[in-house]
């Protein structure tokens, strides 16, 4: 983001803004919402190309892009997004990340944790990033989701609209228990009994709030692999203006936060259409 955005005060709605340093041409550092970058980083065309958003698959990237557009519109920011969505291909995402990290383009990378419990170990893909520092470093931003995968933080109203019959009676889709949606496997589904086993496996009591409930009742339905795709079809059918109604800053706080991250990286250019 350029100086004009800072001057208009719009930077308050973003995670950060870029300040180009014309004195130290090599500097590249992040501090309290400011990414300071020496002009040398923009002398090569690679440094001025649209930023890359690296995710495990294209559909994840498309969903984050939709979230970023919706975030901008919710803040009445009439600017567009320019993002090059790239797919890492699951476990090979780390290889793609490493190549980008050696390059000259600015990029952000968001991956699933695949954790089924707060105390669980990271999944196979996320484990490969053990040595990578989260947050800002040099030309990139990196984050492992604070939940199982992207399906766990899709806007509540979107999932409710797309799968209203399927989620009926399932506890994590009751607003009272929505926080427990974070680690349940939406693809495989989870019963109360299975949640207890997961607690025992990891030596925790995360799901203990459901201890008095019959174990054969559903915590989360089995969506299979099509939930994200179905949600994306519905999301794409909405105008950006109407999409705002399906995102709640309180219920969907993790989604809104990530949408802000992606919007901060890709904002610029012509205004969004409503």
Language-model features: locations:
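Context-gated lysine
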Residues: 8, 12, 25, 69, ...
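Charge-biased C-terminal accessory regions appended to nucleic-acid-, cytoskeletal NTPase
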Residues: 1, 214-274
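RecA-like P-loop NTPase motor core
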Residues: 3-117
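Sequence-level detector for tyrosine residue identity
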Residues: 26, 39, 64, 71, ...
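Activity-critical C-terminal alpha-helical subdomain
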Residues: 127-227
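Generic preference for well-ordered secondary structure
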Residues: 37, 48, 134, 138, ...
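Generic detector of well-ordered alpha-helical segments enriched in charged/polar residues
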Residues: 2, 6, 94-98, 151, ...
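Glycine- and acidic-residue-rich phosphate-binding/metal-coordinating active-site segment common to enzymes
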Residues: 73-173
């Amino acid at each position: 983001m350029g100086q004009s955005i800072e001057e208009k005060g719009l930077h308050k709605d973003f995670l950060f803004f870029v300040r180009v340093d014309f004195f130290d041409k090599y500097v590249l550092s992040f501090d309290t919402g400011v990414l300071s970058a020496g002009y040398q980083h923009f002398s090569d065309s690679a440094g001025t190309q649209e930023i890359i958003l690296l995710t495990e698959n294209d559909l994840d990237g498309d969903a984050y892009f939709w979230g970023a557009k919706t975030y901008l519109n919710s803040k009445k920011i009439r600017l567009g997004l320019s993002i090059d969505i790239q797919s890492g291909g699951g476990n090979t995402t780390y290889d793609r990340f490493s190549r980008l990290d050696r390059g000259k383009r600015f990029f952000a990378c968001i991956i699933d944790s695949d954790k089924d419990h707060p105390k669980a170990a990271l999944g196979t893909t996320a484990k490969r990033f053990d040595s990578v520092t989260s947050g800002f470093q040099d030309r990139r931003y990196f984050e492992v989701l604070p939940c199982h995968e992207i399906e766990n933080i899709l806007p509540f109203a979107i999932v409710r609209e797309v799968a209203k019959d399927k989620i009926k009676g399932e506890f994590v889709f009751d607003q009272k228990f929505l926080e427990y949606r974070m680690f349940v496997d939406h693809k495989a589904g989870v019963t109360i009994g299975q949640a207890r086993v997961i607690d025992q496996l990891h030596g925790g009591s995360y799901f203990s709030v459901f201890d008095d409930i019959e174990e054969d009742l559903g915590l989360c339905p089995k969506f299979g692999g099509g939930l994200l795709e179905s949600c994306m079809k519905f999301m794409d059918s909405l105008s950006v203006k109407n999409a705002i109604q399906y995102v709640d800053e309180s219920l969907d706080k993790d989604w809104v936060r990530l949408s802000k991250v992606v919007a901060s990286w890709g904002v610029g250019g012509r205004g969004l259409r409503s």
